[in-house]
Amino acid sequence: NGTRAEMVREAVETLGGMQAFVKPGQTVVIKPNIGWNKAPEFGANTHPETVATLVELCRQAGAKEVRVFDHCCHNGAYEGSGVKEAVEKAGGVMVDGGNESQYVQTENPKARKFTSAKVHKAVLEADVYITCPPLKHHSGSEMTACMKNVMGTVWDRGAMHKNDLHQCIADAVYFRKPDLCVLDAYMPMVRNGPVGKDTNDLVERKTLLASRDIVAIDAAG
């Protein structure tokens, strides 16, 4: 129990603190879910408090720069979600996720189906990669958590939907596995995901998970 910020700090501390992941002078990329232009109370996106706390922890660990981005589905999602304001107050930098020029064609030799894609260069270039989605119901994939959040790092998400979505989600993790996974299940969306209709779609759980293992954290979620 506690606030999101308190739970993020406690969860990261159990893994050795942010200094176990971030060294002084390193660049960090944080990938929340900011797909939708909806206010925080609707639970469609990662809560701004969760993202901002991760930015603060990275800065305190000595990160040179902390970049935050998503490949949004709605225009204005950075602002409408409250994430942009929170990140900038915490000392982070919002990076454009909606411009194809920011994505680099990358091969994926371990993949079964999703063998090549354009991946956001912020993910490819960062010293440390953190993923931090909310736990939600999803009409297409049943649930969305850390592995599904990887979809927002590639340009052509449509190709994933057309070609065995579940396998493509698993394949996409191989482009680059996150160093730290934080799953915000404080107020998960249990129906009508991934966007939701109203706050009745949310259930208070006051839970937050953190792990180095993206498969383990999704299984626990």
Name each model-derived stretch.
Residues N1-A220:
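N-terminal and secondary-structure boundary signal
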